[in-house]
A protein has these predicted regions:
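A domain-level signal for the structural core that forms small-molecule/cofactor-binding pockets
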Residues: 1-264
């Protein structure tokens, strides 16, 4: 049983905006400290950023990111605040886990891979908001701006049960980290995957567990406390390097947000 959404789903638009802002932070510092929350919809985009004092994240640059990804010009309500001094001090000497967390990485299943590829193929054709479900042999396709030809292509699927719909951020609001099931499948996390730098265990340990689970072909469980320098027998500094390379290969944090860890 698996649900997948495409990059134009409102929640993924929020994730992508948050990811793009993190990408911007990484152009300014090698190891920035940043956390981004995005709520977008109905002509407004609300963003709260907690970050290093020396990051220069100006409103013009962020508005450009919002406009590009949302393909609109929503009113931007932006609040940028410095990272808490105690959290910042945690990273003074060496890179350590920036928060507490529980994690379980899981191998990608055939069902998840199949549905993700179906979602990608449909998205390539329609390039608009879509959500898809695969349960055993039952396929449900909710694809905005799609005509009857989609029914003809997927004759055994349940396609758009309510008929034609437009979708997008003028129909539904989007928020960061609200589609973790789509991003991570059977994996378990105590926190969100998007809008955070690599000092945040919710990003780094989640992705490391995912990489390891798919390499070993079995579940990988981990937990950490804020300030831990080692998880699963691996130094956090080394773990960050591994995950940074993984994200670099994908194309950055914005690209990670498009499809999550289960990718076409």
């Amino acid at each position: 049983m698996f649900e997948k959404v495409n990059p134009k789903h409102p929640d993924k638009i929020a994730d992508r905006i948050a990811g793009a802002i993190v990408d911007l932070a990484y152009t300014q510092k090698e190891d920035p400290k940043i956390a981004v929350e995005v709520l977008i919809g109905h002509g407004e985009c609300n963003i709260i950023i907690e970050c290093d004092n020396d990051l220069t994240l100006n409103k013009v640059a962020i508005q450009q990111i919002v406009n590009r990804i949302s393909e609109s010009e929503p009113k931007l309500n932006l609040k940028i605040v410095p990272q808490d001094v105690h959290l910042a001090a945690n990273q003074n000497d060496v890179l350590k886990c920036g928060d507490n967390g529980i994690f379980k990485g899981m191998p990608i299943t055939d069902e998840q891979e199949t549905l993700t590829n179906i979602a990608y193929d449909i998205y390539e054709k329609y390039n608009s908001d879509g959500k898809y479900i695969f349960v055993a042999d039952k396929l449900i396709i909710c694809q905005s701006k799609a005509g009857k030809e989609l029914n003809e292509e997927y004759v055994d699927a349940k396609v758009n049960p309510l008929g034609y719909w437009t979708g997008g951020i003028d129909v539904d609001s989007g928020a960061t980290n609200r589609k973790l099931g789509s991003d991570m499948g059977d994996a378990v996390t105590g926190g969100g995957l998007h809008g955070k730098d690599l000092s945040k265990a919710d990003v780094t340990v989640n992705i490391y567990c995912h990489i390891l689970a798919n390499k070993l072909g079995k579940e990988v469980k981990a937990c950490c406390a804020i300030g831990d320098e080692e998880v699963l027998g691996c130094s956090y500094e080394k773990m960050i390097k591994i995950v940074k390379e993984y994200i670099k290969d994908i194309g950055g944090f914005e690209k990670l947000a498009e499809w999550g860890l289960i990718r076409p």
